[in-house]
Amino acid sequence: MNGNCVLIPHAVVELIGNLDPVYIQTAGDMDYGFRARKAGAKIWVAPGYVGDCAPNNKHLLWRNPELTLRDRIKLVNTPHGLPFKPTFHYARRYGGWAWPVFFIWQYVRGFLRSIF
């Protein structure tokens, strides 16, 4: 489940609780969806858009190739970047035996995409 607008039945909240507080911006919705499915909840997806929002400021994105490497490194551990603690938590929870590779690869891939 990936979404900014999600309706969660009370019964699901009773079953698995609320969002994991480790996720400050990224992956909280996906983690919740995985936990809900594991607990037996059904996930329904709307057939179209249910909302719209303005895109993030490009100059705040850590993968922006227009920024210096130093500035991108500063931005990577911000809520709109790829913050280390929640990314580590998500990789460890869902990455299987290769979770360290999954964790590191997300940063390598992001920096490679910003270079090429």
Question: What kind of region is each of these model predictions?
Answer:
Residues 6-17, 22-49:
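A short, conserved alpha-helix in the catalytic core of glycosyltransferases
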Residues 34, 38-114:
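Active-site-adjacent helix/loop segment of glycosyltransferases
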